[in-house]
Amino acid sequence: MEDFVRQCFNPIIVELAEKAMKEYGEDPKIETNKFAAICTHLEVCFMYSDFHFIDERGESIIVESGDPNALLKHRFEIIEGRDRTMAWTVVNSICNTTGVEKPKFLPDLYDYKENRFVEIGVTRREVHIYYLEKANKIKSEKTHIHIFSFTGEEMATKADYTLDEESRARIKTRLFTIRQEMASRGLWDSFRQSERGEETIEERFEITGTMRRLADQSLPPNFSSLENFRAYVDGFEPNGCIEGKLSQMSKEVNARIEPFLKTTPRPLRLPDGPPCFQRSKFLLMDALKLSIEDPSHEGEGIPLYDAIKCMKTFFGWKEPNIVKPHEKGINPNYLLAWKQVLAELQDIENEEKIPKTKNMKKTSQLKWALGENMAPEKVDFEDCKDVSDLKQYDSDEPEPRSLASWIQSEFNKACELTDSSWIELDEIGEDVAPIEHIASMRRNYFTAEVSHCRATEYIMKGVYINTALLNASCAAMDDFQLIPMISKCRTKEGRRKTNLYGFIIKGRSHLRNDTDVVNFVSMEFSLTDPRLEPHKWEKYCVLEIGDMLLRTAIGQVSRPMFLYVRTNGTSKIKMKWGMEMRRCLLQSLQQIESMIEAESSVKEKDMTKEFFENKSETWPIGESPEGVEEGSIGKVCRTLLAKSVFNSLYASPQLEGFSAESRKLLLIVQALRDNLEPGTFDLGGLYEAIEECLINDPWVLLNASWFNSFLTHALK
């Protein structure tokens, strides 16, 4: 039957049916008759609304393949097939705009011509019996009921069949075809009977032979036979005392359930050690941009041309010198690498025609920085499997690091507004259905709150760098290509702006597997003096490369300009995710949307406008040592976005583990706050699982410290 459903119905319908069943915890592979029934019902709903439109005069018309430009509105709004929250949002929206009474149950369609909700029924029994069942359940005069059967009969409220003969005949023909197809495969009897709750063939299904032996072998301990086990499962009451249940399941398990009280949880233990260091792939709050406004130079949009143009806006270059060496590196090589970039950019300018890409000369400093010829030689396993002391490298345990204040500052900066807009509003066509109107409205409000956010700049910067690096890694595998780090934005006045943050030089990149590493050297401009927080810059060699004149309230001041240089690496899979950083916008929008939905369901109307425009209302943003912080809805949008962006920038196994394990403790604490009297066993084990992820990652350590603030306030 499952195969039949997948062959017989449109894949979109099959997917919707699977979703609906999963929402109710049902398995399409097991409850195959139900699966078929849901698909049939969905298809009838879609066929009911197909080709039916309302023209400019408000008349109902049928258009099968007409002028796509005609101003037509769909006659029916389809409610069936949406997830519950969305379906109720559509229903509420229709009720608010039309004044129709709100139904108690989710109907299938709304008819804009007759201004009424429609309940569609498809039955394998007598139509009048099914009609009465529906009417009894709905108990509403306002909802129109229309029942179809597989035998070509139909029944509708007050014999008003809504649609023309031909449209209804199409539905009946399709139902008859489905029935014949089922019958030819021997599926119809089981399908027909399953609606009436008669005993079906499946229930008398006997397990014999090999299957029976396998079933007997795979019984849990202490069960003598399959019947014995079935009886036990049928009689198992899921509620009640957990200890009893566990001992009932197995003699080996003995869990003492401890009550979880306000005094039970302790704060997470953060590691001691030297302060943690910056490990993002590019500078965040410390980045400095060289920019051109309204770019219109020849070759505008070609990264190398743009970069040279940006470099020319700065006149304060000076002889570079090292101000903060890298502890382990050969620092003069970093200095030589920067000088080489300047020299090769100068060479390009002296050429007649500027090339579109630039491959650096393979100098000794670049070979060193990019780890050329440093990888151990790979030997075929066949050649060395007889070596007696073959073993894996001993790798050092990571050194524990303590939380440093810089990561909180980074996060605060990411939530702030910049004076430029980093995303454009997509051009999306006119809204047709009410749900699209709500969606566009939410998207526009959200975009307005986050388009100028620094986290959005990080998204666009990340997308650009990862795309450029992945492209170069595939297109110029053996070359040390010079890749400018560029972003584009618009100023307050709406002028276009191109920004250069620095350069990347990529190493050899024969990336066969997703996890194969490409090395790169990054060189990024900054005004931050590294000597203020040297621990943050452990992995960097920092040069002083110029002096920049800055306009301040007291006039022009000269500040030293630094170049942060480091060796780094990434992989195909990391670049793929980096290219998709725009997803962070979607994730935070969905979080905001669920807040709006919660408000709307309380008020029983769409609260989008009030939500964004009520400037006096504040919302909880997070917990700090001082207590729960609150802010405007815009601040909430930007904070959620920044969290999502940092999860991407600082993605790591430590973060995965911490998020998964700390969530369990969070749920227990929330249950305590809701007075649900939670109980736990092996709380120590849970703490261990959380704390083994707290090693040295700055973002994870910051999240752990936030978690501790949350614990303190939650348990007051």
From Swiss-Prot:
GO cellular component: host cell cytoplasm; host cell nucleus
Motif (Nuclear localization signal 1 (NLS1)): 124-139
GO molecular function: endonuclease activity; metal ion binding; RNA binding
Cofactor binding annotation: Binds 2 manganese ions per subunit.
Enzyme class: hydrolase
Binding-site residues for Mn(2+) 1, renumbered to this chain: H41, D108, E119, I120
UniProt short sequence motif Nuclear localization signal 2 (NLS2), positions renumbered to this chain: 184-247
Cellular compartments annotated: Host cytoplasm; Host nucleus
Keyword tRNA processing: no
Cofactor: Mn(2+)
Residues the record lists as binding Mn(2+) 2: E80, D108
Annotated InterPro entries: INFV_PA, PA/PA-X, PA/PA-X_sf
Enzyme Commission identifier(s): 3.1.-.-
Modification comment: Phosphorylated on serines and threonines by host kinases, including human casein kinase II.
Alphabetic keyword roster: Cap snatching, Endonuclease, Eukaryotic host gene expression shutoff by virus, Eukaryotic host transcription shutoff by virus, Host cytoplasm, Host gene expression shutoff by virus, Host nucleus, Host-virus interaction, Hydrolase, Inhibition of host RNA polymerase II by virus, Manganese, Metal-binding, Nuclease, Phosphoprotein
GO terms (BP aspect): cap snatching; DNA-templated transcription; symbiont-mediated suppression of host gene expression; symbiont-mediated suppression of host mRNA transcription via inhibition of RNA polymerase II activity; viral RNA genome replication; viral translational frameshifting
One Pfam match: Flu_PA
Family in the record: Belongs to the influenza viruses PA family.
Subunit structure: Influenza RNA polymerase is composed of three subunits: PB1, PB2 and PA. Interacts (via C-terminus) with PB1 (via N-terminus).
Stated name of the protein: Polymerase acidic protein
Species per Swiss-Prot/TrEMBL record: Influenza A virus (strain A/Chicken/Victoria/1/1985 H7N7)
Originating gene: PA
